[in-house]
């Protein structure tokens, strides 16, 4: 929380940005006052799947250009523990393909949806 504002954080590759990405961002936006979006770097993506089709600089540029996110940052790690300390987020939104992988954040007081 920043002041009395609820901070929502989500992250993803956002390669080939599509309708479901936008719906997820719209959902995340509705959960709080400030939406921060982390865009996975090419190096991070390469650690768990094949390289993205769209390069990182273009993906982060697309995310900055759309309505919804208040802040867009590079996501360099799948571990979000340091991000909690820096960004003070209250809610972490995960896509369907990541459900269950961030439950450890709940032990740190973060609502994972």
Regions found by a protein language model. Give the residues of each.
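Nucleotidyltransferase catalytic core that binds NTPs
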Residues: 1-113
């Amino acid at each position: 929380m920043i002041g009395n504002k609820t901070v929502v954080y989500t992250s993803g590759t956002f390669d080939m940005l599509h309708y479901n990405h936008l719906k997820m961002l719209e959902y995340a936006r509705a959960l709080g006052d400030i939406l921060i979006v982390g865009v996975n770097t090419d190096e991070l993506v390469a650690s768990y799947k094949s390289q993205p089709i769209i390069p990182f600089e273009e993906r982060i540029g697309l995310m900055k250009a759309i309505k919804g996110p208040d802040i867009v940052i590079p996501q360099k790690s799948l571990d979000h523990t340091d991000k909690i300390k820096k960004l003070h987020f209250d809610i972490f939104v995960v896509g369907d393909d990541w459900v269950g992988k961030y439950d450890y954040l709940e032990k740190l007081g973060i609502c994972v949806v």
